[in-house]
């Protein structure tokens, strides 16, 4: 799934993964950067463009395919689509919700640098998974987590 409108995030699709993503259906929001579609087409990958619940599609009464709503991140969009497709076991891999112990915001091999967002926001201490220690996060990740938790409660 891709929601972002920027060229820098479209570059995630500018990689050749061979057969690994051959049978993947890439779901992109209607506001996705054109380069993302160009890269998907260039590698003959299947993709679907879905409008988000924004004012312009509502204004022009674009209802034929309905909308994605309450999807501020790829994780939210993926969860929403999984629920609509009646999937029962949904696993999130790689969702940003906390900094690594070394302060990195992303994995070492992240194309925009491991500390891409490390100094972008004020760090906040929060309870780590399992409740045995505290980790650093920031307000945007906490907001994303709260929306995701509300979605899980609503659709479970």
Protein language model features and the residues they cover:
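Metal-ion/cofactor- or nucleotide/acyl-coenzyme-handling active-site neighborhoods
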Residues: 1-156
């Amino acid at each position: 799934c891709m929601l972002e409108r920027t060229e820098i995030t479209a570059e995630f699709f500018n990689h050749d993964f061979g057969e690994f993503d051959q049978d993947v259906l890439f779901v992109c929001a209607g506001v996705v950067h054109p380069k993302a579609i160009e890269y998907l087409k260039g590698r003959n990958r299947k993709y679907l463009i879905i409008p988000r619940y924004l004012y312009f599609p509502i204004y022009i009464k674009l209802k034929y395919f309905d909308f994605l709503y309450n999807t501020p991140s790829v994780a939210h969009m993926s969860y929403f689509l999984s629920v609509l497709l009646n999937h029962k076991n949904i696993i999130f891999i790689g969702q940003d919700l906390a900094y690594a112990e070394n302060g990195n915001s992303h994995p070492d091999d992240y194309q925009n640098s491991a500390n891409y967002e490390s100094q972008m926001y004020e760090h906040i201490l929060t309870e780590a998974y399992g409740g045995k220690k505290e980790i650093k996060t920031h307000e945007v990740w906490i907001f994303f987590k709260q929306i995701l938790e509300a979605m899980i409660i609503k659709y479970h």
